[in-house]
Amino acid sequence: MLRAIGRVYFRLKVEGLENIPQKTNFIIVSNHVSFLDPLVVMAAVPKKIYCIALRDLYRIIWMKWFLFLTETLPSGSVSEKAVRLLTRNKNVGLFPEGGVSRDGTLNEFRRGAALLALKTGRPIVPCAILGTFEALPFGARFPTPRRITLKIAKPMYLLKEFDTVIEDTYLQDGIFRVRNKVKEMLYAGK
């Protein structure tokens, strides 16, 4: 149903679908400018994605119901739940800005996605979503039809040098590289 709505109402366009790993599970990481973003990822990627949402959203009754239907997980103990999913060969979707951008710009990324990648050895698939801010900006109540594009980059493996402690420098470097890839896709051609 999500795919049908995405393709008809939003004229969803997907670039780089061939970059989705076929032989391993993965962590999708994307910018976050609208509440539509997780739905776009779930509609566009033909594999099941378990997205992580802010725990506060579960306080809104209709949102809690919707998050339950889409099998979205609350944040908080993200790494524990996400590690469990990844070790069970499930795919995880994260929006590491920590919330929806109120002005549509790309904010700094938190390190959780890099930590997951380093802990599990799974690749991060950077994505850039364009058009959702215009379709449903922060504070809007109902989406308007707009062209939405999901750009998918090649998987990135974040490897640590030693099998001991994951150092802060690995996390910072890893998430910096992922954010730069998302930024590059967002602003390509502008």
Segments from the language model and where they lie:
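Alpha-helical membrane-targeting segments
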Residues: 1-11, 59-70, 139-145
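Catalytic core of membrane glycerolipid acyltransferases/transacylases, capturing the structured
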Residues: 20-81
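A residue-level signal for beta-strand positions that form part of recognition/binding surfaces
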Residues: 11, 25, 48, 147-149
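Helix-to-loop junction immediately C-terminal to a conserved catalytic motif
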Residues: 1-32
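Non-catalytic C-terminal accessory region of glycerolipid acyltransferases
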Residues: 79-190
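Short gly/ser/thr-rich secondary-structure transition/capping motifs
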Residues: 7-15, 73-77, 132-134
